[in-house]
């Protein structure tokens, strides 16, 4: 029926993907589970390819895609750098912090940064020659006990950030910098303590959408009292 409706509307059906238990992927708050957590992930992809070869007109999809107009754009500002020296950026990366953005990392490298990865779970300290540190997202609440027990890393995080070097923390990384983080077991674990507060799991979805904030001091991405959305 869907095909007939599409044809009546002048839309050419390109295919479909049937419901298939072998293609099911578990989800979690914030999205799907990581590829490294899925058993037989490669086999699922192979099965998906086999299914789509039978139910999707791949040649028609490619032909249609080639008719799309080229997107013309200009960057609003070319940041660039005149610095001849190398800047070392330490990025948290492990089971707890797995939401990394390749484009951002490539941008940093193209602008004179040397990327150094460290694990808040397994390593004892942030690389000593770091000029800046980034804590991106992930699921620290799933590893709250392990993160809390790594006292030497927490001490290093406090020392480095208190020294005044640039630090960016978002999502799970932002939670890690709080005084306490509620784990998936419902217990509250001591964290880095940079931010005086507790990060807890709400019982329902809080909100999506934009917020307006007014910075009370200058920062890397803001000016004091200049509203942001």
List each model region and its residues.
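Cysteine-nucleophile active-site neighborhood
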Residues: 140-221
């Amino acid at each position: 029926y869907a095909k007939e409706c599409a044809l009546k509307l002048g839309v050419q059906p390109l295919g479909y993907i049937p419901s298939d238990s072998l293609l099911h992927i578990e989800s979690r708050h914030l999205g799907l589970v990581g590829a490294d957590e899925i058993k037989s992930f490669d086999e699922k992809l192979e099965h998906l390819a086999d299914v789509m070869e039978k139910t999707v007109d791949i040649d028609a999809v490619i032909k249609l895609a080639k008719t799309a107009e080229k997107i013309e754009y200009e960057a609003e500002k070319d940041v660039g750098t005149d610095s001849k020296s190398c800047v070392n950026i330490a990025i948290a990366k492990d089971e707890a912090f797995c939401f990394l953005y390749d484009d951002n990392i490539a941008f940093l490298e193209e602008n004179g940064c040397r990327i150094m990865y460290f694990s808040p779970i397994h390593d004892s300290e942030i690389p000593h020659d770091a000029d800046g540190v980034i804590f991106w997202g992930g699921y620290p609440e799933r590893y709250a006990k392990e993160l809390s027990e790594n006292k030497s890393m927490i001490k290093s995080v406090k020392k480095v950030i208190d020294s005044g070097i640039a630090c960016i923390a978002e999502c799970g990384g932002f939670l890690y910098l709080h005084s306490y983080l509620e784990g998936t077991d419902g217990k509250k674990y001591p964290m880095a303590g940079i931010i005086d507060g507790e990060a807890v799991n709400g019982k329902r979805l809080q909100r999506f959408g934009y917020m307006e904030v007014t910075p009370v001091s200058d920062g890397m991405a803001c000016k004091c009292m200049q509203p942001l959305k």
